[in-house]
């Protein structure tokens, strides 16, 4: 089972009182959104960007980028995080996750700075109360050559994720590997890493576009999913090529209770209106109150 911040807190000696280990803000956020249901978040470009807009859309959380390559990441700056904390406190919308998009051009397995960036991001996630980190592998960072893993890169990735996993677990943060992989490939990789702090960040749009059986993958990845990205090219959810109802059924079948993060487009060019439309669709799909 993938580690969640709520699981981390419940495992402490005094429940939420033990949240002092991860900061007062994290304690507040751990109880801000019920863990007994799916939560809906979005990347900043999918709804208008501000936490106020996210609240108007009915979102529970926002996925935030960590910034571009630098010795010290943007998100590692306490002043940057303080602004996000104020946004959270003002709106009740939490930081669901941090996205390390810079790793697509500076791959986790090979870039000498990548382990330090991951450590900085874990510290930032812990401070912000974010439960997950997106560790992506696209473009030159993709883990596959054809249908097979790139052996040197994958071997290096396994070692680096093994090294980072204890810090993530101690902070109550899950590391989500996002790459267009089948469930079988994900499980092979995750079994090699061997930590419940590392799981699959599954993108339904990318996977459907690659011809994968998304509902079957979701069922096979029960207990190994950190989060999911929902998108369908340039379409509103439910109106494109991705068949959403079987995906919703699969998530219910595995009793998924984590985050669904929108990575949707804006067909009308009104980001907030489109963000609300897609949020409402996901809530209806998953049987959540609007």
What are these regions (language model features)?
Residues 2-41, 48-60, 91, 129, ...:
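Histidine-acidic metal/acid-base catalytic patches
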Residues 76, 106, 145-149, 232, ...:
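Short amphipathic alpha-helical segments at helix-loop
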